[in-house]
Amino acid sequence: MSIKSDKWIRRMAQEHGMIEPFVERQVRGEHDSRVISFGVSSYGYDVRCADEFKVFTNINSATVDPKNFDAGSFVDVKSDVCIIPPNSFALARTVEYFRIPRNVLTICLGKSTYARCGIIVNVTPLEPEWEGHVTLEFSNTTTLPAKIYANEGVAQMLFLESDEECEVSYKDRGGKYQGQRGVTLPRT
């Protein structure tokens, strides 16, 4: 497997719709204001967080069960900023919609700007032939409220191309998150 460069990412986005909408350069500021960077980087793509959030509150004192998750444990927020309570988490989604090629595995890593503030971004790998908006999980590991900015960079996608095509892709096996749009809760 080899990591793919900015040239490859740009070509795949423009010719094959791998990332939509696609920002072909790294943006660090807009209209004289600084933003957390997003867009193409040397060997990755920095994704943005959309303005849709589900903030975990557990007002119902439910047990967190991935097989039977209580959607009522979330408060829906639509805003340019999301405040995550101390020691809690929020779900969001990327602005970008992804279409991963059959011979590519995509790994997501959180941006250091957030990590240095105690905010951890978690995303599982984007498997070969998966497509959709990426559901992002933000963990606030601090004892203070934490702020997430919509429409700014939150994580970096790294694209790993295999020498050999997989036998069965995510699409082939009918993965449960195939084609997801919006913030998607756990499914079993």
UniProtKB/Swiss-Prot annotation:
Molecular function GO terms recorded: dCTP deaminase activity; nucleotide binding
UniProt entry tagged with the keyword Hydrolase: yes
UniProt keywords, alphabetically: Hydrolase, Nucleotide metabolism, Nucleotide-binding
Pathway assigned in UniProt: Pyrimidine metabolism; dUMP biosynthesis; dUMP from dCTP (dUTP route): step 1/2
Matching SUPFAM superfamilies: dUTPase-like
GO biological process, one term: nucleobase-containing small molecule interconversion
Catalyzed reactions per annotation: dCTP + H2O + H(+) = dUTP + NH4(+)
Residues given in the record as dCTP binding sites: K111, S112, T113, Y114, A115, R116, T135, L136, E137, Q156, Y170, Q180
Enzyme nomenclature, EC number: 3.5.4.13
Active-site residues from the entry: E137 (proton donor/acceptor)
Pfam family for this entry, one: DCD
InterPro entries the UniProt entry points to: dCTP_deaminase, dUTPase-like_sf, dUTPase_trimeric
Subunit structure: Homotrimer.
Similarity annotation: Belongs to the dCTP deaminase family.
Protein purpose: Catalyzes the deamination of dCTP to dUTP.
Protein name, per record: dCTP deaminase
Lineage per the UniProt record: Bacteria, Pseudomonadati, Pseudomonadota, Gammaproteobacteria, Pseudomonadales
